[in-house]
């Protein structure tokens, strides 16, 4: 579906924005410019065929996809060849930018929409990202499979669901001692207040909540860390759709 000639990648302005935003995050993105440019080209190529993302403009993609994804690196959680799950990856965010900048990570990108998974597979191939794979499926099903349950050191999700729902979807994937990061917008306090008892039921606890501003745009973001402290009881996650309809908190 995504074969063929790629349209042009990032413009000089787009590259400059990416470098400037990376600097604001403490990252030197110059060695990765070509990879991000190719990823942008793939997004543009696919946008006429598949509804991958509502963001189409170059600056929007650079700031709200690439740089937003890389805010994860403000947390000291990514050292070494960790196995990482990106749940609800969509067009590959935050997983693909994270893998570009931290190639040693072993990354599995999961989405429930087949066309989005096909795009991510194509991006992994074109970018030559070794140790990354895209997977179609629902969290409630995959988290019960032996190769996925309590099999990841880290998990990430960006704007997938409220924290009370997301915690039930993410924590079963984590090994004890692992950590998940929920990427949230400006208002997170109401979601945090009822969360601790639900996390305890799932074998977890609330870790750091890092408030930050998105480079260049100044938009408020929060990175919410969920720590895995004990095995998740076999009852979780519940059947597909149940966590959304009947959240634990």
From Swiss-Prot:
General function of this protein: Specifically methylates the N7 position of guanine in position 527 of 16S rRNA. Shows a marked preference for deproteinized 16S rRNA as substrate and is completely inactive with native 30S subunits as substrate.
Major enzyme class: transferase
GO molecular function list: rRNA (guanine-N7-)-methyltransferase activity
Protein name: Ribosomal RNA small subunit methyltransferase G
Family, similarity comment: Belongs to the methyltransferase superfamily. RNA methyltransferase RsmG family.
Region entry RNA binding, spans: 245-246
Keywords: Cytoplasm, Disulfide bond, Methyltransferase, rRNA processing, S-adenosyl-L-methionine, Transferase
Top-level taxon: Bacteria
Cellular location(s): Cytoplasm
Predominant cellular place of this UniProt entry's protein: cytoplasm
Catalyzed reactions: guanosine(527) in 16S rRNA + S-adenosyl-L-methionine = N(7)-methylguanosine(527) in 16S rRNA + S-adenosyl-L-homocysteine
Knockout mutant characteristics: Low-level streptomycin resistance.
